[in-house]
Amino acid sequence: MSVVSLLGVKVLNNPAPFTSSYQFEITFECLEQLQKDLEWKLTYVGSATSSEYDQELDSLLVGPIPVGVNKFIFEADPPDLRRIPTSEILGVTVILLTCSYDGREFVRVGYYVNNEYDSEELTADPPAKPIIERIRRNILAEKPRVTRFAIKWDTEESAPAEYPPDQPEADGLDDDGAAYGQEEAELEAALLKELQEAEKNESTKGEDHDMEGADNGEEDISDAESEDIEDESDDDEDEVDEEEGNDADEDVEMGDDSEPKDDNANPAAHHSQQEVMVH
């Protein structure tokens, strides 16, 4: 269980000029007294093709952290244009808001950012050299990608398990991999049978409209097979995600839920919101 839970992140100045600072109102809850500060960072992804253009816009130590719900403002400088390829200034990129405790990252929030000109004329016919003062950024604040990691806090008991617990009863269960392979074989056999029947009808009747009907049947079967396989693949992916719980406990999209709940924000309901010291 995480000692610190991120309740919400609100982008304060959005949209804004490209050269404006980034401002976030961050709300989180602390369940225990912490011995050290939290470190927040904002990173700008300068290029989708190479991480060498990533730049840390700012970092902030927050503490001491009182138990309860806390809120603070995180402000970061805009990216250094000299470290961004000219061809990558316009378009869609990503910013990453992360928080670490004692050097161990436990939460990451990613936002898409669209950088575009403030007029349709410049957008339709952009100049060879970008006009920075005419570029505006728009953060897709409604759909952040939030990833949480299990880490060790102040005690050894809080450290995540290095290995999954023993489950001897699982040895007697059916092998999902074998069952999946059997279903694949059954689907292929059914498809082959239908194709053979369609070819047989084609050779006996030889009429164009019968041929069209057989083709449609084949397409329907292929579609059904594709959908089943996709569903099964999704199930497998869900199982893989669960096995990777030690590395990333949760990877969800925070839409409307990214805003802190009323009962958390209400001082009379649970904990009083406290302004924490940043330095």
UniProtKB/Swiss-Prot annotation:
Ranges of compositional bias, category Basic and acidic residues: 194-212
Positions with biased composition (Acidic residues): 168-187, 213-260
UniProt keyword annotations, A-Z: Chaperone, Chromatin regulator, Coiled coil, Nucleus, Transcription, Transcription regulation
GO cellular component: chromatin; chromosome, telomeric region; cytosol; H3 histone acetyltransferase complex; nucleus
Region listing for Disordered, in residue ranges: 151-279
GO BP field: cellular response to stress; DNA replication-dependent chromatin assembly; nucleosome assembly; nucleosome disassembly; positive regulation of transcription elongation by RNA polymerase II; protein modification process; silent mating-type cassette heterochromatin formation; subtelomeric heterochromatin formation
Chain ranges passing through the membrane: none
Function: Histone chaperone that facilitates histone deposition and histone exchange and removal during nucleosome assembly and disassembly.
Subunit structure of this chain's protein: Interacts with histone H3 and histone H4.
UniProt name for this protein: Histone chaperone asf1
Gene responsible for this protein: asf1
